[in-house]
Amino acid sequence: IRDSVYGAPNPCIADFDGDGDPDLICGEFVDGLTWFENVGTRTEPRFAAGRPLANKHGEIRLHLEMIVPVVSDFDGDGHPDLIVGDEDGRVAWVRHTGKVKKGMPQFESPVYFTQQADPVKFGALSTPCAFDWDGDGKQDIIAGNSAGEIAFIRNLSGGENPVWDAPRLFTVNGRPIRIQAGENGSIQGPAERKWGYTVLSVADWDGDGLPDIIVNSIWGKIEWFRNLGGKDGLRLAPAQPVRVAWEGEAPKPAWNWWTPEPGTLVTQWRTTPVAMDWNGDGLTDLIVLDQEGYLAYYERFRTPEGELLLRPGRRIFHGTNCSLYNSRSGVADASEGLLRLNDGIGGQSGRRKICFTDWDGDGRLDLIVDSQNACWFRNVREERGEVWYEYMGNVSERILAGHTTCPTPIDWRGDSTPELLLGAEDGHFYRMANQQKQAR
């Protein structure tokens, strides 16, 4: 049995084939279920080689990873069904039909349960960006998650405590967006092949007047989805690479096995690509960690032919009391220097979720970074196009992160004092008040 299941078997026991002795069905680390027929007896069990549980549609696969089945005759028909949990907390019913075909019990394909309205949730490791997507004057939530999806969560009511619509998935060519690692896209190996870890920002990237979505993922590729408009606002064009006018080959993290296409931007995985007009020239720039973990500014420009490109990233951000940051301990190097938000390699790289907002009300953009909740770096000086930040610590004492949170600024009170909305590992969204005395 050890060699038949792709890790984390989570076995459940029942007489699945109706022959009077208990059999096994195991979950796994990825997305499948494995059937082990008991060819022995109840008192002396002996199991045939495992086979992927399948039905007339093919192998039964769940939506995400880390599959945990339990036995329950959920519909009371006398046959043992499976109730199966995924990594992101969703639960599916896999109904036993009561039939056996070629020695295998026949189950229907998974049907995921839904529930009545409750606190807003979007999968696991949710990554919100607050933005008025539908143009009705209320900040909505555009979010990614560990499954590699992107959702529109509409603000229905406005006001200080909004009422929210259920998450609706963005689509390309009629199919929900689903960025996944596949067999070789994760730097932590093929066991992560169904994860995508989308993290994003929203801006009018092509200047057509509609907001677009700029995204990073498990791959570390910075891409963008063009907004096609339409009544529901969910239709996007296929992903396109963000273009950079490199002077040579496109750089990449040292541990990447694959080479970026010329003119594309590949950086550390799972880090926020902040699309904003940083220099106030009317073009949308990009701020993101570079391939070595330094916070970098990619300035937008227009070529003589009219094409919009990014210049190679420049390290214009400095830390006055924290030149190297760690999301668990905070300051990893207290000396002054260029701001490096992660010096980890391989699987310890990237993961930084960032945003900019005037947190203390002094008229300068401060930097917010993921931590056990979120921390902030105060903008203390701007000189010759460069910025110096002072590390100020966490904005709250509440612990929300096992891996990372994802902050985005909100102003639901409408008083121009920013608060934070944090996406957390549990997929829920948490509101953090601003305790800073505003300089305004």
Residue ranges and their predicted role:
Residues 18-27, 76-85, 135-144, 207-216, ...:
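Acidic/hydrophobic-patterned starts of short beta strands in beta-sheet-rich repeat architectures
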Residues 1-6, 39-64, 97-123, 156-195, ...:
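Blade-edge motifs of beta-propeller repeat domains
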Residues 293, 347-380:
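Loop/turn-rich, solvent-exposed surfaces of beta-rich toroidal or solenoidal domains
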Residues 31-32, 89-90, 148-149, 220-221, ...:
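Loop/turn residues immediately N-terminal
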Residues 35-37, 93-95, 152-154, 224-226, ...:
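Conserved blade-register residue in beta-propeller folds
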Residues 6-12, 28-29, 86-87:
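Solenoidal tandem-repeat scaffolds enriched in leucines and small polar residues
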Residues 401-440:
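Blade-level signature of beta-propeller repeat domains, shared across WD40, Kelch, NHL, RCC1
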Residues 9-16, 67-74, 126-133, 198-205, ...:
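Beta-propeller blade termini
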